[in-house]
Structures are given as C-alpha cells and as structure tokens.
C-alpha cells in the first residue's frame, strides 16, 4: 500500500507535465509560479536520476483534455490560496508546510520571490530521496537545497506523533502557517487523518489549510466513488479509506473544527462549482482554445467528485 501511494506522485507529475506542455498553466495566476521553466529544469535532471520515472512523464503530453482541465483546476485552486496567504502576510515571517509534497515545486517560485517564507516539504522517505537527488542534479534547482528557508524531510504522515514532533522541530508554532495537502488525506485511514488535523490545529496558533481530494458522492445512486475505488484496487492495489465516508463537501470539511476560543472560518466547494464560479470568463476562453473538449458532461461528473477546502484559524486574534 505504501509503495502504491508513492507511485501516485508519478501520475501527478505526469499530469502536471501534460498541463504545462499544452499551456494550461501558462496563463492566469499560475503564471506567477513559472511552471514551464521550473518543471523543464526538473525533468532534465529527472532523466539523469530515474529514466523509469522520466519515461512515464515524457509521453504525458497527449493527456485527454478532460484530464488537463482537472490538473489545471487543482493547480490554480491551490495556487490561489498560496498567493492569498503570501499577500496577507507580506510583512511577516511565515511558514508553508506541504504534507505529502511529492514532486511539487511550488517552493521554487515562492522562495525566489519571498525571503520571509520558510517552506517545509514532507513525504515518504523514498519520495523525498528521489526529489532530493533530482534537485541536486540541477545547477539551478540545487541552490534550494542549500537555502536555509527550505526544508525537505521524510516522514510517514500516518505516524501522527512523529509527524507533529517533526513539525514542532522545524517550525515556529506562533508564526502564520499554511498547510497544503493535495490529494494526500484520501490515502490515509480516517482515525490517523483526524488525529493529524486536530494535532496541527492545536500546534499552530495562527494557521491556514488548503486541501484537495476526491470524494465518493453522497447521492444513493452515485456510483462514481465505488467504481473509482474498485479500479484502484484492481489496477494499483491501492485504497482510499475515506473516499466513501467523506463523500460530500460538507462532510469532508466537518473534520476541521476549532478549539473553543479560536477565530475560525471554513470554505469548501466541489471543483465543478469552483470552475463555474471562480475561474474568470477570459481564462475559461483561454483554456477552451488549447484543446477541443467535447466531453463537457464527463468534465462535470469528474470535477463534481473532487473537493477544494480552505480554512484558517487564530487562537490569539488580539
């Protein structure tokens, strides 16, 4: 199961490369993360480190439009919250913690532009070692491993006490902190997920959290989650323990609860609603011109089963 989860990062990287190759991430707010340049450099190094992983990414430029739309939406939805966090705390020392970071490279543009940010990437040991080796091979990206504001550490998020101890060691709990969990919590057991959420909310006094995951669907006739789960078992020997439990945006969001004396706000929506309500009309037109999309109903069904969640809390508002 652990190895199967780690391999999902190759899928995520391939999807990101496809969306970059087809220019989905060349406009809108994602321009600020310079994905084409950063991932181009990363792939060049990846080729030297792991031809197996590189080979899977190399041919990903032909992803179906509906898949590129999905990658675009999850990327910009998280980018939006990262930029908002940075803008709201532009004069303060802050922290960003990406749990289950995989090959995500947001830290490159964030650290290049914001000297007030400490950026912590956490994932399984094998994933972290691959990322470290790839970064080291790059004359450009290797500098981030020497940056005092960047931390790349291995941990098993299911071991909640160890994870919280690591966070307490690397972070200052009193500083504003943004947690990112992108398609991560869905692979964790419910008990450990809840314990991790509760522990992080207790640890950081002024925190924000953006999370993206699939959800099974709450309608009794909705078979999306059941079919997805069965396909993952058959093809990947992979489980999503909470897919059918946290099957609506409201249930998904209910796991984040404040301590009694905290200011707390919470926003959650499915990705189809996000696309319709949050993506500007001109941006919709831009991506529409990139590839012909004739599966609009399929896009609606798929994105209705993914959720973007955001919350922030402050235990010391005064």
UniProtKB/Swiss-Prot annotation:
InterPro entries referenced in this protein's UniProt entry, alphabetically: LCMT1, Ppm1/Ppm2/Tcmp, SAM-dependent_MTases_sf
Coiled coil: none
UniProt keyword Transport present: no
Biological process according to GO: methylation; protein-containing complex assembly; regulation of autophagy
Membrane-spanning parts: none
Single Gene Ontology MF annotation: protein C-terminal leucine carboxyl O-methyltransferase activity
EC number(s) given by UniProt: 2.1.1.233
EC class: transferase
Reaction(s) catalysed (UniProt annotation): [phosphatase 2A protein]-C-terminal L-leucine + S-adenosyl-L-methionine = [phosphatase 2A protein]-C-terminal L-leucine methyl ester + S-adenosyl-L-homocysteine
Keyword terms of this UniProt record: Methyltransferase, S-adenosyl-L-methionine, Transferase
Residues noted as binding S-adenosyl-L-methionine in the record, renumbered to the chain: 74, 100, 123, 156-157, 182
Gene3D superfamilies (UniProt xref): Vaccinia Virus protein VP39
One Pfam family from the record: LCM
Purpose: Methylates the carboxyl group of the C-terminal leucine residue of protein phosphatase 2A catalytic subunits to form alpha-leucine ester residues.
Family the entry assigns: Belongs to the methyltransferase superfamily. LCMT family.
Protein name in UniProt: Leucine carboxyl methyltransferase 1
Designated gene of the protein: PPM1
């Amino acid at each position: 199961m652990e190895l199967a989860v780690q391999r999902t990062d190759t899928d995520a990287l391939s999807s990101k490369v496809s969306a970059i190759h087809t220019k989905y991430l060349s406009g809108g707010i994602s321009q600020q993360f310079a994905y084409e340049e950063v991932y181009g450099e990363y792939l060049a190094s990846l080729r030297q480190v792991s031809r197996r992983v590189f080979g899977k990414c190399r041919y990903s430029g032909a992803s179906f439009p509906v898949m590129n739309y999905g990658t675009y939406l999850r990327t910009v939805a998280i980018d939006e919250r990262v930029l908002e966090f940075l803008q709201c705390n532009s004069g303060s020392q802050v922290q960003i913690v990406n749990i289950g970071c995989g090959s995500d490279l947001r830290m490159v543009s964030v650290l290049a532009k914001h000297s007030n940010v400490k950026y912590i990437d956490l994932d399984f040991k094998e994933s972290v070692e691959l990322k470290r080796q790839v970064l080291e091979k790059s004359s450009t990206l290797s500098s981030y491993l020497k940056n005092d504001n960047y931390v790349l550490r291995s941990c098993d998020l299911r071991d909640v006490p160890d994870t919280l101890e690591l966070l307490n060691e690397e972070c200052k709990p009193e500083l504003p902190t943004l947690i990112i969990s992108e398609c991560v919590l869905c692979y964790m057991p419910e008990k450990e997920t809840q314990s991790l959420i509760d522990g992080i909310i207790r640890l950081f006094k002024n925190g924000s959290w953006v999370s993206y995951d699939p959800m099974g669907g709450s309608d009794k006739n909705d078979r999306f989650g059941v079919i997805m789960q069965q396909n993952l078992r058959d093809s990947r020997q992979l489980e999503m323990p909470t897919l059918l439990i946290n099957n609506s945006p409201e249930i998904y969001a209910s796991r984040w609860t404040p301590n009694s004396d905290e200011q707390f706000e919470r926003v959650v929506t499915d990705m189809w609603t996000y696309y319709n309500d949050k993506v500007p009309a001109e941006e919709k037109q831009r991506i529409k011109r990139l590839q012909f999309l004739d599966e609009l109903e399929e896009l609606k069904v798929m994105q209705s089963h993914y959720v973007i969640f955001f919350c922030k809390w402050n235990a010391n508002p005064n």
